[in-house]
Amino acid sequence: MTTIFALCTPWGRSGVAVIRISGEDAAKAFVHFGINSSIKPRTATFTPLYDKDGEVIDEAIVVYFVAPNSFTGEDVVEFHTHGSFAVIKMILAELGKIFVPAGPGEFSLRAFLNNKVDLTRAEAIVDLINSETEMQAKQAIRQMSGVLEKLYQNWRQQLIDILSNIEAYIDFPEEVNSSAIANIDYLLNNLQKSLESHLNDDRRGERLRQGIYVTILGEPNSGKSTLFNHLAKRDIAIVSEYAGTTRDPLEAHIDVAGYPIIIIDTAGIRESTDPVEQEGIKRAKLKAENADFKIVMLPYEKRDIFNREIMSLIDDKSICILSKADNITDQKLIPVFDFSFIPISVYCNIGIENLLNLIKQKVEKDFQFCNTDPFITSERQRKHIQNTLNIIKSVDLSLPMEIVSEDLRLSVRELGKVVGVISDDDILDNVFGKFCIGK
């Protein structure tokens, strides 16, 4: 394979920039930059970098990793230089004379091809790079540790063991009896239950990776946009005394106790003859249906007026709040028509911490990490696991063992696609195409 290079840190002024080279000719960079000092593997060496005229480009820390003891499994050289636009441009220009620029995710792709990471760990690297909150990072790091790979490899090995028994029965049909068939059926049923339990996770891993949706609902002028802007810590929604100002749902990303929350401001819900407002209300209700959680608002001064349409939105996913409670002194929950409401006032900063704590409690209850069974974190993983389950469920042990064997061989192949034991170009393009250049 060609020797590749790329800037691994973002473009821009910084204290340090890291430029990585990977491939069998990586050490040629030492000669090209006039590095005379002995570069010991896995040791940080301070040295000047020279251009072809003998002029110093920069003073750098050079680290050399000899294959296979590197991230990619190949010889790797890293230049830790000053994060100057000029310095970076000069070094990359020099490297372009002897090496090939890396494509997006090409370093990680080589790590995969050299068996340094499986596909689930490669996906975790992308997720860690893209993580914006503590819990997103923790989920990615947990996956990078290999918990998903170990789980899927264990299931795959179970299928291989069952398949081996069936292949033996094909070669020695006299060994096939009711006890042997019952044992295979027992093993397949246990594996089926494990796969079903794993898939029945309410998509927690994907939702945590992408963001947890919390929709704000209420009648017009109940303070939805004011609360939305306060939580977002910037003015996104227009706040007006005129009802019906908000039409299209607005989104903002916030961090609540390390969880990625996407809050959504929506149109006020009421009876309306305005077709544009009706469409906004329709979209608000649709956002409510698809949300992970809902904040249902009633103005404090209207707490004794039963609003059937607003009350009908309350369910076990809801946090109920009484807005505009500016003069309240007791922040305890207030009963309103059999529901408990939190009094808040954005203007007086009353009850906001209580609201955030309730959001935290609800999110932690649904998204806390399980120590025994890790979450699926991508649609790609889910698809192959579901395909594996479908194949196992279709196995008919009353059919000839040759047919059963072929079905199980397909299931082994499908599970192998999750970790990359079996892969094709489309799968690799899908996974590594999400990386930035330099990773």
Swiss-Prot record:
Q: Which UniProt keywords apply?
A: Cytoplasm, GTP-binding, Hydrolase, Magnesium, Metal-binding, Nucleotide-binding, Potassium, tRNA processing
According to the entry, every stretch annotated as the TrmE-type G domain falls at 211-364
User: GO:BP terms for this protein?
Assistant: tRNA methylation; tRNA wobble uridine modification
Q: Which InterPro entries match?
A: G_TrmE (IPR031168), GTP-bd (IPR006073), GTP-bd_TrmE_N (IPR018948), GTPase_MnmE (IPR004520), MnmE_dom2 (IPR027368), MnmE_helical (IPR025867), P-loop_NTPase (IPR027417), Small_GTP-bd (IPR005225)
Give its E.C. classification number: 3.6.-.-
| Localization of this protein | Cytoplasm
Q: Major location, coarse class?
A: cytoplasm
Residues involved in Mg(2+) binding:
S225, T246
Q: Which PANTHER family match?
A: TRNA MODIFICATION GTPASE GTPBP3, TRNA MODIFICATION GTPASE GTPBP3, MITOCHONDRIAL
What function is annotated for this protein? Exhibits a very high intrinsic GTPase hydrolysis rate. Involved in the addition of a carboxymethylaminomethyl (cmnm) group at the wobble position (U34) of certain tRNAs, forming tRNA-cmnm(5)s(2)U34.
What family is reported?
Belongs to the TRAFAC class TrmE-Era-EngA-EngB-Septin-like GTPase superfamily. TrmE GTPase family.
| Name the record gives this protein | tRNA modification GTPase MnmE
User: What organism does the UniProt record list as the source?
Assistant: Ehrlichia chaffeensis (strain ATCC CRL-10679 / Arkansas)
